[in-house]
Every structure is written in C-alpha cells, then in structure tokens.
Amino acid sequence: MLSLDFLDDVRRMNKRQLYYQVLNFGMIVSSALMIWKGLMVITGSESPIVVVLSGSMEPAFHRGDLLFLTNRVEDPIRVGEIVVFRIEGREIPIVHRVLKIHEKQDGHIKFLTKGDNNAVDDRGLYKQGQHWLEKKDVVGRARGFVPYIGIVTILMNDYPKFKYAVLFLLGLFVLVHRE
C-alpha cells in the first residue's frame, strides 16, 4: 500500500505544486551532474569514482569497494601503484597494480599490470598484440577508498528490476515530498 499512498499524494497536488516538484527533481539531477563534472576537472580523471567489480585485487580491495581516483599528467606512474585502465574493445575499466615499467630511450613509458589475487600478469587481458599499457590507457590512480559502499551499484547492475524499483521510489519521493 506504500506505493498507492504516493500516487494518492501526487493526484492531490495542484498543477503548481507538481510543477515545483518536477523542477526540484530536475535541480537535484543537474546538481549531481555538475558535481560529477567538477570532480572530473579537479581530479583530471574521466571517472573520478569507480567501484571494484571483482575480487582480483584482494586483499587490497574487495568487490564493492568505492575508489577515488586522480589522473594528473605530471605525476609519473610507479611500480606498485594501483591504476584503473581501459582496454580497447572493453567497456568496463579494470583496477590492477603496476607490476613492471618499461621506459624507452625517448622517455616514452609503458607498463604491465596484474591483479593482486591473480596468478599471472594482465597480458592476456590486453588487446591482441598489446604487451604493455600506456599512459593514454589509464583512467586514474587509486588515492583513497570506502569499503563495500559500492555494493549498491553492483546490485543495481546485477538485478535491473531492483535498480528500476529504487529509481522509481526515489523519483516518487522527490515528487511527493513537500517542504
């Protein structure tokens, strides 16, 4: 009966109240987008916050940990650093540790990664013929984390009905909530 109460509240609103609530919802969404874009500029990363999706980095990071990233051009990549990188042809970025660095005479740096919980390096994950990653492949470097808070994101991706139910309820709450 909880959802019916929400619908009754929406029906009882006059047009002005409903318009105000829709605008309020729009302000919340646009504020979230502005905060995200601001974080992108400050951190230099296209994705300043990511969720660890697998157990390949255990015990350092667990599935569902939320990572905060930076990607400043002037900072050199070092062995032992945890980086988030994209592989051509794959949509989801990977969180792994830098295992080796290969520096050419011209100063161009390439590096090899490996998950802490994996037996072998990541060459099998890279696109065919690629043996090293380059700076352009890096989304960011881990600078901090919050344990397990990202499990909500994993649940929403694994169970789409759960995601739509949560989004629907949040939207209804914003529309019905009166200040």
Swiss-Prot record:
Regions crossing the membrane: 17-36
Alphabetized PANTHER family for the sequence: SIGNAL PEPTIDASE COMPLEX CATALYTIC SUBUNIT SEC11 (PTHR10806), SIGNAL PEPTIDASE COMPLEX CATALYTIC SUBUNIT SEC11B-RELATED (PTHR10806:SF28)
Predominant location category: endoplasmic reticulum
Record's bilayer topology term: Single-pass type II membrane protein
Membrane topology, Lumenal segments: 37-179
Stated role: Catalytic component of the signal peptidase complex (SPC) which catalyzes the cleavage of N-terminal signal sequences from nascent proteins as they are translocated into the lumen of the endoplasmic reticulum. Specifically cleaves N-terminal signal peptides that contain a hydrophobic alpha-helix (h-region) shorter than 18-20 amino acids.
Cytoplasmic side: 1-16
Keyword field: Endoplasmic reticulum, Hydrolase, Membrane, Protease, Signal-anchor, Transmembrane, Transmembrane helix
Gene Ontology biological-process annotations: signal peptide processing
Reactions listed under catalytic activity: Cleavage of hydrophobic, N-terminal signal or leader sequences from secreted and periplasmic proteins
GO CC, one annotated term: signal peptidase complex
C-terminal short (CTS) helix: annotated segments: 165-176
Domain comment, as recorded: The C-terminal short (CTS) helix is essential for catalytic activity. It may be accommodated as a transmembrane helix in the thinned membrane environment of the complex, similarly to the signal peptide in the complex substrates.
Family to which this protein belongs: Belongs to the peptidase S26B family.
Name assigned to this protein: Signal peptidase complex catalytic subunit SEC11A
Catalytic site positions: 56, 96, 122
InterPro entries reported in the protein's UniProt record: LexA/Signal_pep-like_sf, Pept_S26A_signal_pept_1_CS, Pept_S26A_signal_pept_1_Ser-AS, Peptidase_S24_S26A/B/C, Peptidase_S26, Peptidase_S26B
Superkingdom of this protein's organism: Eukaryota
Assembly and binders: Component of the signal peptidase complex paralog A (SPC-A) composed of a catalytic subunit SEC11A and three accessory subunits SPCS1, SPCS2 and SPCS3. Within the complex, interacts with SPCS2 and SPCS3. The complex induces a local thinning of the ER membrane which is used to measure the length of the signal peptide (SP) h-region of protein substrates. This ensures the selectivity of the complex towards h-regions shorter than 18-20 amino acids.
Protein source organism: Mus musculus (Mouse)
EC number: 3.4.21.89
